[in-house]
């Protein structure tokens, strides 16, 4: 073989390798790299709002806010630019206001371990609840039937309630009665935001597919706002550095090569975060702030949904 032919052959081989390597760096933007999903179901959960003596750590007040089977709608969109990488945006929102419950406990006597004051508000409305989650998954292990990897993302969750009417028992039962029916007593909002890390996995056998996700954060920031309407007082708290644990289990069946019906369960737990509190008198405009661990915020919730996923 002539020298020129050998050189030409080598150049052709190297050129082909370079083109192959270059093509691997180009993200896949074809329709089949995109997946969308929608589902509907129910949200339930419970939040706690606490107030402490910042110097002694003694609990002074606790409000328990419940969420009872509120209807939600979920949406999810994923893009696989490479076989080893998935970009995802997902979220859910309440479809309408829903049912809740609130119990308010106070410990006004520091020498008494049991609460002294309690009010109950069965006619509590969940005004709204929603969440969004932006994340990326890197698939470290892959085969025809499974893949496993790591994930990182940012998540924000909000809840809002209004308690109306109800009954009360104050000073160890010395004063009892009822609040006027339908009258607003307390309104409460919570917001949690955080970056997170986690593990992700997927397994498929024939037309059945199982997905699992575990999320963890040590960097939760929480905010709340409490409106005591009958006292014209506003309480605001901020906390940071608390923990979050979450899991998502998704099981589905492919009714066509591109369409999957699925059911999904999610569980989220925001551990109590402690921080300072601010009290605002809405009549006078006066404000008092207390630092340290004067307040606490926590939540745990779960969703159960069913829906349809489609890959283009």
UniProtKB/Swiss-Prot annotation:
SUPFAM superfamilies: OMPT-like (SSF69917). One of its GO terms (molecular function) is aspartic-type endopeptidase activity. The keyword Aminoacyl-tRNA synthetase does not apply. Keywords: Aspartyl protease, Cell outer membrane, Hydrolase, Membrane, Plasmid, Protease, Signal, Transmembrane, Transmembrane beta strand, Virulence. Disruption phenotype: 90% survival of infected mice, mice develop a robust immune defense. It catalyses: Converts human Glu-plasminogen to plasmin by cleaving the 560-Arg-|-Val-561 peptide bond that is also hydrolyzed by the mammalian u-plasminogen activator and t-plasminogen activator. Also cleaves arginyl bonds in other proteins. Residues 21-31, 81-84, 141-145, 205-207, 256-258 are periplasmic. Changing residue 106 to A: Extremely low plasminogen cleavage, no autocleavage. Residues 41-70, 95-131, 155-194, 217-244, 268-301 are extracellular. Forms a narrow, elliptical 10-stranded beta barrel with the active site pairs on the extracellular surface. This is Plasminogen activator. It comes from Yersinia pestis. The gene is pla.
């Amino acid at each position: 073989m002539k020298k020129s032919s050998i050189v030409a052959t080598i150049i052709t081989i190297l050129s082909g390798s370079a083109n192959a390597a270059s093509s691997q760096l180009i993200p896949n933007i074809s329709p089949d790299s995109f997946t969308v999903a929608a589902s509907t179901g129910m949200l339930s959960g419970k939040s706690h709002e606490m107030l402490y003596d910042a110097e002694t750590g003694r609990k002074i007040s606790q409000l328990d806010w419940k969420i009872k089977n509120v209807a939600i709608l979920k949406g999810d969109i994923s893009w696989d630019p490479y076989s080893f990488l998935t970009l995802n945006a997902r979220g859910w929102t309440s479809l309408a206001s829903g049912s809740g419950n609130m119990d308010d406990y106070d410990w006004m006597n520091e020498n008494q371990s049991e609460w002294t004051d309690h009010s109950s508000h069965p006619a509590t409305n969940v005004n709204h609840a929603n969440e969004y989650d932006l994340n990326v998954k890197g698939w470290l292990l892959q085969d025809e039937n499974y893949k496993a990897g790591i994930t990182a993302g940012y998540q924000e969750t909000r809840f809002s309630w209004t308690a109306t009417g109800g009954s009360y028992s104050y000073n160890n039962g010395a004063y009892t009665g009822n609040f006027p029916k339908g009258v607003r007593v307390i309104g409460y909002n919570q917001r949690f935001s955080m970056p997170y890390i986690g593990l992700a996995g997927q397994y498929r056998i024939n037309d059945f597919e199982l997905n699992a996700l575990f999320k963890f954060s040590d960097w939760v920031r929480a905010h709340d706002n409490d409106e005591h309407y009958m006292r014209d007082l506003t309480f605001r708290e901020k906390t940071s550095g608390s923990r979050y644990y979450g899991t998502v289990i998704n099981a589905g069946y492919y009714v066509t090569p591109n369409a999957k019906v699925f059911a999904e369960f999610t569980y989220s737990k925001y551990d109590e975060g402690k921080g300072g509190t601010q009290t605002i008198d809405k009549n006078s405009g006066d404000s008092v702030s207390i630092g340290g661990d004067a307040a606490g915020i926590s939540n745990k919730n779960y969703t159960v949904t069913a829906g349809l996923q489609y890959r283009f």
